[in-house]
Amino acid sequence: MIYRSKETVCSITVPRDPEYLALVQDILEHPLVRSMEAYTQHGETSCLRHSINVSYLSYLYCRDHGWQARAAARAGLLHDLFLYDWHFHAKETGNYFHGLTHPRRALENAQRLFSLTDREKNIILRHMWPLTPIPPKSVEGFVLLYADKFCGTAEVAGRIKHLLGPVLRPRQSV
């Protein structure tokens, strides 16, 4: 499936999918969630853009398989709600274990702002498996886990391709 139409929310394009937006609009409109735009996640991708990517991909896959698309969409937007730039976090705090600790921080922040189901809580808390030792309990958790890895890889690869573009272009014969 190809979804091309988009609308802008806080300078970020989001899918113009009425069913998806109905599930996540309250999250997208929250000022602290919108502040994720200020933090870089992968390459030049903001934490908000990454979370929207993960959320929508997880939503589509779960919807198309008859699983709990709402839980996947909402947890996807909140899975990285740690609210700091992890590139500088270790130097500033001495915490060198962002990969291990940010799921709990994201969950704590999400619980302060929104009412979450047990499934959504587990998806957020377990999205870094196998780096963290306990896997998700639900199929939606595994979908989000893989969507997160896929989107992160694509975001970094896009940056690498941009940087290496001049090197990778074929030479023109003279």
Give the label of every model feature segment:
Residues 1-174:
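Metal-dependent phosphohydrolase cores
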